[in-house]
Amino acid sequence: MEEFQRYFELDRYQQHDFLYPLIFQEYIYALAHDHGLNRSILLENAGYDKKSSLLIVKRLITRMYQQNHLIISANDSNQNPFLGHNKNLYSQMISEGFAVIVEIPFSLRLRSSLEGKEIVKSHNLQSIHSIFPFLEDKFLHLNYVLDILIPYPIHLEILVQTLRHWVKDASSLHLLRFFIHEYRNWNSLITPKRPSAHFSKRNQRLFLFLYNSHVCEYESIFIFLLTQSSHLRSTSSGVLLERIYFYGKLEHSVEVCAKDFKAILWLFKDPFIHYLRYQGKSILTSKGTSLLMNKWKYYLLNCWQCHFYVWSQPRRIYINQLSNHSLDFLGYLSSVRLNPSMVRSQMLENSFLIDNAIKKFDTIVPIIPMIGSLAKAKFCNVLGHPISKPVWADLSDSDIIDRFGRICRNLSHYHSGSSKKKTLYRIKYILRLSCARTLARKHKSTVRAFLKRVGSELLEEFFTEEEQVLSLTFPRAFSTSTSRGLYRRRIWYLDIICINDLANHE
């Protein structure tokens, strides 16, 4: 937010809640471009990064000033003199710039609500890896889990109505209406299995923001119920929500909902209950019984349908027992398994054999969905056999190796918390051989002949930085047995703020 303060005259705009003039400011597009630069490990936005420049931004702003009204329809570009031949580029730039603008009032309220309060502000919580040590600590003592697919609103106008409480600028709301009606693939954000490449690549930040702001409306009430029903009430229960404005909203919900929910709070008495969410999937875990989890399930369904105008079905919420269920979350399969052990006890002349089972939290990389992601990205076929990447064959050798190496390092970095590394080694093997096949295709040679001619040192980029850093951190593990010592360790990093593209199997 300090970055915004240096550029924006926020006091003047905030007095009237008037954000629309910011869309004519050049630095808005610079901030949006910096935010999206190299955000995809597959470099799908490289074309946009090369085309974007200050000159294009100036030309775009000039055209907006010259028009009596702003029309940016991708469907009738032949009749639209504003966009001309750059309709996709201009539309994407305005969409990403508008996403920066509409986040301003939420960021301001979040900052003001944090002032003077004893809420954890550690930067460690910004990493999505920070959730796994929490799960490791808590899941061993829980019984049931609700796998929840969050429903989507029945009408796009509901998204605008949600923001009307925070953005009073009618012009900004009209522009928002235009964007959400131009790209009608709203359902694809929550159900990514539907085809939505046009939607996800061009407007991801704006629609993720709209989705989070909408979900937060009923999450605020839900979090209130959780804190009221738990004996261990947390003063910072909103810290794991995707930070937009939620602290003030939660406090307001306590005042409004205290009277309304007293009658039902006794139904949800549970001292050990935890809730977490990422994008369109949320998880509710509890130490309670299956009856209690069924109460939560049907309460959520009724709350969504009766109070928030979203349609959901019971089959979108699954009740599972943690002891025999693997949790698919953030690209990992997490489970609680029993690790049996036998202890021999000697007392005087008698000896006893004691069977002891210890619960252990396991996190592994799911191999089948991972191969599916690699096959979709054209690194291998559906059976996991590496293939060449023809679209990269026109690049230089160094660029090809750099792209494959970056993907490999990012995957190793993201999946460093895996309990078993065999899956990760197989993925790295697929990427290395795919890189070799791509280079051989470019030079019109076979893989064997190409590697024999240039040497295996050409693929040294695939040795990850983590291996070098960890060799310094755990020198004994490297000196004794690297494969047995170091690579069995799970390591969670504090610089991962979003799920890896290839790890997002949904």
From Swiss-Prot:
GO terms for cellular component: chloroplast. It comes from the Eukaryota. Keywords: Chloroplast, mRNA processing, Plastid, RNA-binding, tRNA processing. One of its GO terms (biological process) is tRNA processing. InterPro entries: Domain_X, Maturase_MatK, Maturase_MatK_N. The keyword RNA-binding applies. It holds the Pfam family MatK_N. The keyword Ligase does not apply. It is found in: Plastid, Chloroplast. One of its GO terms (molecular function) is RNA binding. Usually encoded in the trnK tRNA gene intron. Probably assists in splicing its own and other chloroplast group II introns. This is Maturase K.
